């Protein structure tokens, strides 16, 4: 991926970047500064965009909330690791950014949800928690809901966190191997159906 394609020119803040480089060889370690700077610029643009969304929500003076969750992390030649992008089963790819924003009116209307959100802020979660948390955040209830997976709920339960690393590996029972911090299950990973 050419990260410079993910932001407009006015967000090309950190340089040198991949901006203007046609078909860069992403595996060329000589382009590490350009790759990392372009990635950081794309995050700068994402932050700006999210701040615009939050500003719009704030201006409505309504009960409002927003959740942001990335789909995966990235390995970006971190330290002495010579890998980039994702699909390498590294710790960098399994840790993802996420946050919740809520209006003052939301906090006033649902103080117990905010208390539980704060209490659960250090819980070990997976993206499997997102669907259930989004519905709970929106106060949407249904007969088969699973509040034990919502980080807005007092019923939140710790569950095994499986990641796709040579089968379904128990992330919390894994060791981190090598400079790239590759996730290796200490036990036997669950078989994946193809």
Predicted regions and their residues:
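Catalytic domains that recognize anionic headgroups
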Residues: 1-194
């Amino acid at each position: 991926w050419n990260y410079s394609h993910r932001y407009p020119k006015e967000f090309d803040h950190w340089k040198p970047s991949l901006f203007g480089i046609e078909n860069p060889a992403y595996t060329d370690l000589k382009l590490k500064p350009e790759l990392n700077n372009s990635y950081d610029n794309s995050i700068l643009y994402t932050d700006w965009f999210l701040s615009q969304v939050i500003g719009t929500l704030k201006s409505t003076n309504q009960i409002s909330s927003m959740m942001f969750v990335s789909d995966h992390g990235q390995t970006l030649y971190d330290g002495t690791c010579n890998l980039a992008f994702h699909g390498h089963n590294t710790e960098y790819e399994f840790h993802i950014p996420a946050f919740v924003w809520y209006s003052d009116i939301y906090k006033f209307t649902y103080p117990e949800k905010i208390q539980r959100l704060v209490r659960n802020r250090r819980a070990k979660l997976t993206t499997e928690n997102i669907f259930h948390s989004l519905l709970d955040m929106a106060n949407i209830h249904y007969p088969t809901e699973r509040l034990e997976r919502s980080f807005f709920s007092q019923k939140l339960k710790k569950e095994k966190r499986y990641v796709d690393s040579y089968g379904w590996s128990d992330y919390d029972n894994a060791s981190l191997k090598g400079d790239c911090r590759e996730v290796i299950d200490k036990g036997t990973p669950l078989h994946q159906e193809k």
